[in-house]
């Protein structure tokens, strides 16, 4: 069968040929980022080698925050301002930056909603970004703990990639 999956206007599974409904369901569960589904798979008895992919979109959800949209996997509590991280040493605009970048940002607010952020806006943004990293770390931790619990490390390679 040929299948694809469209969520919020984006393909999360491009059109492809799938020979097994079980494989299709497994792919969809993993693509949706459900660590619990991966753990459930790891807890099953396997007689053959397998390949498991776990995809997570955080901390990319920082983009929704910048556009004042709800975060798709739940909002994050905002701590008091005095607990937000500081700004990086290279925060100030570099006088040698190309003017074309600022010009492009001024033409397209929806693509660059952070253009007019204040230093405190950036500190809040950075805090949220760090919390999103912590969330995805916790999800990955569930899978790594399942590998431990099932004693699968001698036959397991974990590869982390990111864009």
Stretches found by the model and what they are:
Residues 1-52, 56-77:
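Catalytic-site neighborhoods of secreted/periplasmic enzymes
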Residues 44-48, 56-162:
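Active-site-proximal cap/lid insertion segments
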């Amino acid at each position: 069968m040929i299948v694809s999956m469209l969520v919020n206007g984006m393909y999360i599974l491009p059109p492809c040929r799938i020979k097994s409904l079980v494989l299709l369901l497994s792919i969809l569960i993993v693509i949706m980022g459900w660590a619990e589904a991966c753990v459930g798979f790891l807890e099953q008895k396997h007689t053959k080698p397998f390949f498991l992919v776990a995809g997570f979109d955080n901390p990319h959800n920082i983009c929704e925050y910048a556009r004042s949209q709800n975060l798709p996997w739940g909002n994050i509590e905002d701590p008091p301002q005095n607990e937000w991280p500081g700004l990086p040493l290279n925060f100030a605009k570099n006088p040698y930056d190309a003017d074309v970048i600022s010009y492009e940002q001024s033409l397209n607010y929806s693509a660059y909603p952070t253009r007019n952020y204040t230093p405190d806006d950036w500190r809040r943004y950075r805090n949220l970004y760090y919390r999103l990293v912590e969330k995805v770390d916790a999800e990955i931790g569930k899978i790594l703990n399942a590998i431990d619990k099932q004693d699968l490390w001698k036959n397991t390679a974990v590869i982390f990639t990111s864009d």
